[in-house]
Amino acid sequence: MAEITVGQLAQQTNKEVDALLKQLKSFGIEKSSEKDTLTPAEMKTLLEKINSAKNTATRKKVTSVKLDGKHKINVSVKRKRRVAKKVEQQESTTLEQPQELETMVQEVSQQVDIVKGQDNIEQIVENKEAVKVQEQRQAEIAKPVIKDSGFKITAMPEIKIEEIVTEDDEGLSASDKQAKKKAAKKVFSEAVNTNTKYKREEEEKKSKAKKAGGKGFKKANPRQLSQLAGDLESFDEFGAKKGKLKAPKVKKQEFTKPVENTVRTVEIHEGITVSELAQKMAVKGAEIVKVLFNMGVMATINQSLDQDTAILIVEEMGHKYTLHNENALEEAVTTVDRSSYKKISRAPVVTIMGHVDHGKTSLLDYIRQTRVVAGEAGGITQHIGAYSVKTDKGSITFLDTPGHEAFTSMRARGAKSTDIVILVVAADDGVMPQTEEAIQHAKAARVPIVVAVNKIDKPEADPDKVISELAQRNVIPESWGGDVMFVNVSAKTGEGVADLLEAVLLQSEVLELEAFAEGLAEGVVIESRLEKGRGPVATVLVQNGNLKQGDNILCGTEYGRVRAMHNDLGKKIKAAGPATPVEILGLSGVPAAGDEMVVIENEKKAKELAAQRSQKQKEAKIAQEQSLKLSNMFNNMGKEGEQQVLKIILKGDVQGSVEAIRESLLKLSTDEVKVDIIASGIGAITSSDVTLAVASTAVVIGFNVRADSAAKKLAETDGVEFRYYNIIYDLIDDVKKAMSGLLSPEMKEQIIGIAEVREVYRSSKFGSIAGCMVIEGVVKRTNPIRVLRNNVVIYEGTLESLKRFKDDASEVKKGLECGIGVKNYNDVREGDQIEVFEVIEVAKEL
């Protein structure tokens, strides 16, 4: 045998060079590269190692054979025992296979050497004949083994047809290689088919059919071939049945009805929908809707429910419930650990309250030594002002709230954010409605009150009257044995102002006001607005911690980073401690007044929490709008077409003013006409507001704001009128007038004249004619009349004739005689009165 290189051997055996080198090394043949040659002795050693490895049967061998080019047969062979090398030939012809394989490998190797050395075409023909010989041997090997009565299975060694066919591929063309592969597979396929139980059963069936005189089997169609392939897969290579084929079972979904009712524990979160609740209780959504209907609530399966309603439904249907804590994220983010910080004393936050024009802002103006009132429209405070005042005895933070009725919510918000309330009462006016309301807010917030009796410089001032009126409302002065300090002041002359500040500081010492000056800041939004060029601006009162420029803050549903801070004097500052009012810029939107302000370290968490709060508000609003009760629905039946609607688009300068105006206008609604504020916001009137007004036929109202140029042009084109106001009373009065114009006028009767019957005449043309004297007003021919007898109406109709002597008259005045003929009525008697009236339209007023 000629020498061969490692690379040539790897090419002939279709192996990687590295893998072949590792295999040679495992057999004890050390080769380092593909150019190294293999001696005949090394080749012999290699063959011996391969044969010894082949003597041990593998655990499992799976081969695949294609049938008719479309179907495929997988043949699986399992061996459990070691094949003996020397077994008698008559026991099994297959035991000679290892020696024949060795001879075949040697012959193929010789053929490879010959093909390498010669390019003769005749040699290629001899190679083909050698392949035919190998195919014949393979066919003999694949013949079925003769079985005895015990059906003894002999082990068949592994047959590698691919190795036999492909070892001399270098000398053959591509078509010859393909032909060799097809021939080998065909031989093996026939061998397997003749050795299967299926083949034997087919032959038995054919023989029985011939004996019975049948025509035999028809040619199998593709469906039968597919079935044949499936049958063959159930047999192994030796005809042994692997297992009984069973038709695939169709999975049938079944439901066993429970004998007893299952009590489930339902987790309820805020805003759960009807469909979600039904799914958690394993019932249909229609069942939940039915329960809601019985409770007097109309709902759909997609409607959100509040937790209280969901709890009632769960209990009604016999289940248990647990409440889901949706504030876990908020508690984790907003909770600040201040255990390592110390508290320090802080300045008191004082809110000035009182009735309109009682001098609240004037008093604060004197304290600050500035002219704030001059800047207020009409001298009326329109929104909360936060100011910090330094005195000789310490600093005081003042919150100035509006006093008129519209700003109830703003006064309530001021009371919640304050430590002390200064109740300003005019000495010449006494206790007024907003004074009582301020007392209620202060008591509800449990805030101590210091009463400032203002305008004592006026001659008509009566402080004792104020004290007695407040005492009737349970505000008892210290001089009467109570706990409320009364101070007489004059915002005009400054009398008593120092005593008032001293009383406030004394009250703050009693309260022992403290706060944390370190750590993340907390506070409350006093006011917010949208400014051109600056964006959302919020006035914030810091209550704890230290607010610094650059902090990430969360205010209600808005978040952002503090880009700039200004104090009450308009100066830029970098940090603000407790009880300090500041103006901040950098929020994503305009927060609502009264929202809590917290500093959050992670901006991503702040954004996530703001989105969660916004979603909750939307869901709550939708749930409130959609929850119609049967009683309201029945009450509103028949009123839909009667009620007039005044649609308004409201824009204001600050959030608090817009909120107050909105509440005041909504209170004006009656059964006949209602106010519908379809949109409200802060900032200038824009073109989008005009477009909305045109689409909804609404009135655009601006409070301390104006329309931009684009909105003005669009308004001129579409015929939209803007109404501007800077005093809230004027706005409310004009809206009242507009609502009155929408009301249908009332019809009222007005008596214009009375005639007394003195004598009755008979006329062939008109019947009874009453000779009358006009004793009051004017009797007109065209007006309706009533006939009164003993001051009781006995007839109502019209006049047929009115004459003065013999002439027809259109009217007869007081003190003159006339003849009156009543149409379709002849029972006129002496002493009766004929009352003449007219119907006039009177405009309704709210």
Swiss-Prot record:
Recorded family membership: Belongs to the TRAFAC class translation factor GTPase superfamily. Classic translation factor GTPase family. IF-2 subfamily.
Keyword GTP-binding listed: yes
Region of interest (G2), ranges: 379-383
Gene Ontology MF term list: GTP binding; GTPase activity; translation initiation factor activity
Name under which the protein is recorded: Translation initiation factor IF-2
Stored Gene3D superfamilies: P-loop containing nucleotide triphosphate hydrolases, Putative DNA-binding domain, N-terminal subdomain of bacterial translation initiation factor IF2, Translation factors, Translation initiation factor IF- 2, domain 3
Annotated organism of origin: Francisella tularensis subsp. novicida (strain U112)
Region Disordered: start-end pairs: 198-219
InterPro entries: DNA-bd_dom_put_sf, EF-G-like_DII, IF2_II, IF2_N, P-loop_NTPase, Small_GTP-bd, T_Tr_GTP-bd_dom, TF_IF2_bacterial-like
Region (G1): 354-361
Keywords carried by this UniProt record: Cytoplasm, GTP-binding, Initiation factor, Nucleotide-binding, Protein biosynthesis
Localization per Swiss-Prot or TrEMBL: Cytoplasm
Residues where GTP binds: 354-361, 400-404, 454-457
Transmembrane segments: none
Function: One of the essential components for the initiation of protein synthesis. Protects formylmethionyl-tRNA from spontaneous hydrolysis and promotes its binding to the 30S ribosomal subunits. Also involved in the hydrolysis of GTP during the formation of the 70S ribosomal complex.
SUPFAM superfamilies from the UniProt entry: Initiation factor IF2/eIF5b, domain 3, P-loop containing nucleoside triphosphate hydrolases, Putative DNA-binding domain, Translation proteins
Residues of the tr-type G domain: 345-512
Stretches the record annotates as G3: 400-403
Annotated spans, G5: 490-492
Residue spans of biased composition, Basic residues class: 207-219
Region (G4): 454-457
Highest taxon of source: Bacteria
GO CC annotation terms, alphabetical: cytosol
